[in-house]
């Protein structure tokens, strides 16, 4: 459904979460996607060997590191797949995050998946990153406020398009993707 509505990346959570999927479930979904939809695995503090094992089994094309992974892990994983490093924002962003060895950085709320937004101005110096992905409390209605501050490379949504935890709502997803497509313009 998400790809048909215009999403160009789909996330598969492999960390303990109400949205967690097994590698075989992700692989079954990934096989139904078109060739240009990114298949992103979300991991929290998993050893690089385990991440790569799951990535192969699930057919992933990118990795999102959402824990306290040391830079060395990201550097090792980048030899195999693109890496997105997620940081949790509970106040103004740390400019040092720009130095983390990742292909993109993602900024999420203090409690990922909670739907609780943060202040867009907290992103401050991160707007200079060419591949800034913004997440955290996003909804179709909130995208306009975000775009007033800057134009991220991408936006990432989960709870903002759900009818209940882990259940995507087609109407909310469609509205979000339409608002996202209008962009910063």
Walk through the language-model features, giving the residues of each.
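Conserved N-terminal beta1-alpha1 strand-loop-helix module at the mouth
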Residues: 1-185
């Amino acid at each position: 459904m998400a790809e048909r509505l215009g999403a160009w990346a789909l996330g598969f959570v492999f960390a303990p979460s109400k949205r967690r999927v097994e590698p075989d479930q992700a692989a079954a979904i990934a096989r139904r996607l078109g060739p240009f939809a990114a298949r992103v695995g979300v991991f929290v503090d998993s050893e690089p060997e385990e991440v790569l094992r799951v990535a192969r089994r699930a057919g992933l094309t990118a990795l999102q590191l959402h824990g306290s992974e040391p830079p060395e892990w990201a550097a090792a994983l980048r030899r195999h797949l693109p890496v997105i490093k997620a940081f949790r924002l509970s106040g103004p962003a740390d400019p040092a995050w720009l130095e983390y060895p990742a292909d993109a950085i993602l900024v999420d709320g203090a409690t990922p998946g909670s739907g609780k937004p943060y202040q867009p101005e907290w992103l401050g110096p991160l707007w200079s990153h060419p591949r800034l992905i913004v997440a955290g409390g996003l909804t179709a209605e909130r995208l306009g406020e975000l775009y007033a501050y800057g134009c991220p490379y991408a936006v990432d949504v989960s709870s903002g398009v759900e009818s209940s935890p882990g259940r995507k709502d087609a109407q909310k997803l469609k509205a979000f993707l339409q608002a996202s497509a209008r962009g910063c313009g």
